[in-house]
């Protein structure tokens, strides 16, 4: 596997990005792997590697680059959780859509990347980012996955559900049964909004598990659910990008 750390130059700063892809067989379909709130840490690098190993060019950017070059939540003491919440509140869907354009441009310039077949995946904070990017760039983004994504249906002009009709790619939304950030009524609402739109996709409720079930280094990890999510994500990307 090839791995590199690069800085993508945007109009708002320098976005440090982890890129990984196989040594042979390219160009590879491109995956935008958007980090969750605790930051771009090694756990996410490993998850990006898992996707890349199946034949993808994966980009994992630091979405907090406007404020800091690097942030990782201290999971032992949570002493910097206040900073995390400040960083979370400093970014939004429109910002990430702008960032995604620079990521597309980088992919276009790299012969190892297939920039015409892009998939997006986001977890928690970044679930709505993945869906928003898919709606903003419908010709390039062929698949998008939100894994226990928050704020998918909100009273805002950039709410992700409003982009369903503009999305050409297939959508997959995974929700945990027990989730303090995603109440059952939002799961029902996003399911209805997706069903009533022109988008191709589905919402799947993972019964018996909690928000965060896919992260192997965290307390809510559930191996069975995590592996099911990987099965769904790999199938989604293979079906639409290869």
List PLM regions with ranges.
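N-terminal cap/leader regions of alpha/beta-hydrolase-fold enzymes
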Residues: 1-242
């Amino acid at each position: 596997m090839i791995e590199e750390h690069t800085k993508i130059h945007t109009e708002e700063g320098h976005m440090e990005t982890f890129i990984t892809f196989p040594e042979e067989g390219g160009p590879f379909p491109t995956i935008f792997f958007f980090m969750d709130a605790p930051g771009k840490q090694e756990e996410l690098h490993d998850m990006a590697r898992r996707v890349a190993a199946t034949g993808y060019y994966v980009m994992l950017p630091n979405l907090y680059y406007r404020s800091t070059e690097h942030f990782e939540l201290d999971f032992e003491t949570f002493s910097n959780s206040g900073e995390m919440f400040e960083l979370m509140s400093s970014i939004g869907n429109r910002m990430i859509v702008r960032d995604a354009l620079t990521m597309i441009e980088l992919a276009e310039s790299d012969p190892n990347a297939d920039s015409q077949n892009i998939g997006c995946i986001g977890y928690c904070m970044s679930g709505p980012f993945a869906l928003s990017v898919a709606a903003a760039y419908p010709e390039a983004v062929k698949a998008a996955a939100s894994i226990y994504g928050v704020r998918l249906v909100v009273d805002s002009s950039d709410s992700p559900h409003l982009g369903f009709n503009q999305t050409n790619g297939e959508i997959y939304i995974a929700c945990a049964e027990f989730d303090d950030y995603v109440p059952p009524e939002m799961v029902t609402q996003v399911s209805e909004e997706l069903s009533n739109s022109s988008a191709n996709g589905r919402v799947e409720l993972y019964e018996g598990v909690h928000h965060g079930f896919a992260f192997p280094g965290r307390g809510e990890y559930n191996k069975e659910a995590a592996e099911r999510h990987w099965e769904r994500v790999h199938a989604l990307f293979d079906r639409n990008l290869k």
